[in-house]
Amino acid sequence: MVAAAPSNKEPLPDMMTSIRLDQSGRVEIIDQLLLPHSVVWMPVSTPEEAFDAIKTMRIRGAPAIASLAALTLRSYLSSSSSPVSSSSSSSDVISWVGQTIDYLQSSRPTAVNLGEAMDRIRAALKDSEAQNQTAGDIIQRVKKICGDVHDEDLERNMKMGRLGAEWLWKKRGGGKKGLKVMTVCNTGSLATSGYGTAIGVITALFQEDHLDTAYYAQTTPYHQGSRLTSLELTTLQIPACMICDTMLGSLFQHEDIDGVIVGADRVVKNGDTANKIGTYQAAVLAQRHNVPFMVVAPVTTIDLSLPTGAEIHIEHRPAAEATQVRGLDTETGKLSVVRITPEGVGEGDKPWQRVYNPSFDVTPAELISAVVTEKGVAERKEGEKSIDVASIC
């Protein structure tokens, strides 16, 4: 697809996408474990395959995960393999769909977008039961919600990109030709249904000629920055520079950084934000250097049921993801996995073999300057330690 420009300027080059439907309506995803060296589309036909793709990080990014789960459920309900159909009893349909969405949600509990999407289906099931709807009507209702989950994401990403770019330019654009910004992880079209969240803001700045350079962290151990964000930014021909995670402090010392822009997997009531590991350290450094720190996430990422970030469940990943690295062998031209630690690290139970590998960290609201959703921008007021994110829901 060609992304619509947020101004009257020339359209961007084609963006990558993480999910597509084939001619029969079957869901396919790019195996992101193989990026950027190999683009392989893999079919996802069943809820079990969707669960596995999410769990093994073949697809990642909270909005993209929600889209995959929803689209796979829709496709499966339309297939001959589905255990329920219009000829089933309404109770059987409600029971099976309910169990399936519980299963899909358990694949990535930190991603609130996935939970929100599944909650929409739960609410529909409850209402359908109260109205004594037929099995066929229930299935059609669920399938429509699944499609909406995917379709709504692109439109709101475009809105967030514009709002975030306008806010940061007003904050830091005075007298400057372009801004220098920094981001963590991957938040572009590969992590969403299109355009992206934090990358959407960077793209909007670029489209308005308000961007100097986008710095992006490698984001180890999974290298979402060096593998995926690098691919997206080079595809879009956006001026960018990769930095190692350990170079953040040096970057702030030696470059006039105008803003840190990140996405989120969950934003709770007081503004505390769970995002990819490494976000918290970027926020600490941003505050030390008086740099605005912006979180960009759709309303579906905001969880008002949790008062603070202390209640957010943090997923810990397998040790092998930190002790091994996948890449292209420049001699053979083939993808390979190599160990980067001594043998035994992360594999045994000795005190010297441990590996600490959380997938996310939580950035306190007091380190965040603003949260952007498709509904608006909520700024943290001077001296306060929380952000009124409910005002932009």
UniProtKB/Swiss-Prot annotation:
Catalytic activity: 5-(methylsulfanyl)-alpha-D-ribose 1-phosphate = 5-(methylsulfanyl)-D-ribulose 1-phosphate
GO term, biological process aspect, one: L-methionine salvage from methylthioadenosine
Active site: D265
Principal localisation: cytoplasm
Recorded metabolic or biological pathway in which this protein acts: Amino-acid biosynthesis; L-methionine biosynthesis via salvage pathway; L-methionine from S-methyl-5-thio-alpha-D-ribose 1-phosphate: step 1/6
Feature type site, description Transition state stabilizer: C185
Keyword Transmembrane helix assigned: no
Gene Ontology CC terms, in alphabetical order: cytoplasm; nucleus
GO molecular function terms attached to this record: S-methyl-5-thioribose-1-phosphate isomerase activity
SUPFAM superfamilies hit by this protein: NagB/RpiA/CoA transferase-like
Alphabetized UniProt keyword annotations: Amino-acid biosynthesis, Cytoplasm, Isomerase, Methionine biosynthesis, Nucleus
Record-listed E.C. numbers: 5.3.1.23
InterPro entries: IF-2B-related (IPR000649), IF-M1Pi (IPR005251), IF_2B-like_C (IPR042529), Initiation_fac_2B_a/b/d (IPR011559), M1Pi_N (IPR027363), NagB/RpiA_transferase-like (IPR037171)
Subcellular localization, as worded in the UniProt entry: Cytoplasm; Nucleus
Family, per entry: Belongs to the eIF-2B alpha/beta/delta subunits family. MtnA subfamily.
Role this protein plays: Catalyzes the interconversion of methylthioribose-1-phosphate (MTR-1-P) into methylthioribulose-1-phosphate (MTRu-1-P).
Protein name in the entry: Methylthioribose-1-phosphate isomerase
Gene coding for it: MRI1
